[in-house]
Amino acid sequence: MMFTAGLAADILFYSFCEWILYANDPHIAEMGSMQIWSSTYPIFHWGPIPWSFYLVLAVAFGFMLHVRGCHKQKYSEACRPILGNRADKLPGKGIDLLALFALLAGTATTFSLATPLMAQVLSRLTGLPSSKWVTIGILVVTCIIYTYALVHGMKGISRLSAACMYLFFALLAYVLLAGGETRYILETGFSAIGNLAQNFFSLATFTDPQRTTSFPQTWTIFYWAYWMVWCVASPFFIGSISRGRTVKQTILGGYVYSLGGTFLSFLILGNYSLGLQVSGKLDVLGIYGGAGDLYSTIIAIVDTLPLAPMVLVLLIAAMIAFYATSFDSIALVASSYTYKQMTGD
């Protein structure tokens, strides 16, 4: 549940196409090989640093809930050592309101990124024109699924999370084994991980002080801000489901499962589409340059797979499951902000 709650459908959207956004960037050209750096930066931006945002806070919140026995799951409660009794008054309420607004902004950002892709996939499968009504229909279906899981409590969320993982790994396995780029995916993936390990600190501290390309401002800082917005929800949820686990188990479990799933997604889906470009089987950059549309570019990538309609069905089902699971965790956290005091589990 850590993985599915911490990431919405954005991971599938960006896994296919993030390297495309980097490929023609002047900063990538400065660094050398487009192939290696375009596959390295996605796992850097979605890798150890952002997951550490979640896990460090999850440990703190889990300690507050399960060891200290705190019955208030709010950011204002975490500020009580500083605010004192004012955590229950206007300053504390202001902090909780800011957290809720940040949560709504993060949710809106997530919907705006991946929902148009689902609408185009559905349009492609059914022949219906891609319109706002198709998008609304997708949102309604997603809301029905996550509401059904939510009313069944943690058991419902757990089952939905398991279904999400089955769909997710089925998609990855099919692309890896049936796409015809298995060797390239594996070799480029290992190269990207090694390149990240070798250059991790230089990537993390590069600020482009002369603004020659503004790459870190455009991408790296944007991603850190994007992940920090979700820190108002995901760490609380991870902390709440980590009852009975040690600090070591929470952190290592989060890194092994969540970071592992993230890396697999980018290294398989991203390197598959990159392999198509490098081998000349599909001019991915040309399609994106001509259309200026990542959504149609992703569909063109999926069309190169055997049984492409089946893959599109699997893709949209996995994205809906990711959305529903993520929003279940958000709903639980948002509702906890509204309680004066929580009782029971």
Language-model regions: role of each:
Residues 126-151, 170, 224-236, 345:
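Transmembrane alpha-helical segments of multi-pass small-molecule transport proteins
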